[in-house]
Amino acid sequence: MNNFTVSCNPDTHAPYIQVKVSANDREYVGWGLIDTGCAKSAMTVEVKEYLGFADSEDTHEAYTAGGTVNVPYYFVDITLENNVKVENVMIDLFTSYKNGPKFFIGMDIISKGNLAITNYNGGMIISFEIPSRGTIDFQKM
């Protein structure tokens, strides 16, 4: 089964998960932020360099909070929590920030499955499955 359920950090309330990215016979493991406001998944320059990618001439437009920018992209395999794999993902670069994630898991991956973030009895839980096994309908629960 390609799914996982993990607890969120109670201090940040941010949906962080462990992410492994593979390319060029190398692997990088770090924290990724599940970001529904991010159209495409992305990695930091640090991860790009660790994976042995050269600077890319291939770019495309990315729409950010700061406006439209041209960003390079690369192809990687991504493994999420519980060994959930997504292969040959076109991933963008983003500028890292202090204590920030190494990855953004964007709608390009999220939209391939079902995502639920729930808060019950004070515990915040992230659940994800890929591919989707059906609709989550809170009105029918």
Language model feature labels by segment:
Residues 1-141:
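Pepsin/retropepsin-fold aspartyl endopeptidases
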